[in-house]
């Protein structure tokens, strides 16, 4: 909040795994948006489940204008036994129309 109020940031990179998930990420975005600071969603080494959450947040929030959500692509098996959630074609993510994050998890 302080970085926004003192005009110290042009954009804020929200990382779901560092901030604690979707709810804290939404709070960060709301503070940034109230102070006219754009956001992006970034990732570290998240699985496809976490990336699906991040991409869903990007799609839902007008103030989030950028995304770096490609960590799952570097896995030996990018699907990680969890098909669905989204498709990527030419860097464009298309979300599933299934409920929730749209991922099929079969343990």
PLM region descriptions:
Residues 6, 44-107:
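Flexible C-terminal active-site loop/helix
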Residues 1-50, 79, 88:
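Catalytic core of soluble alpha/beta enzymes
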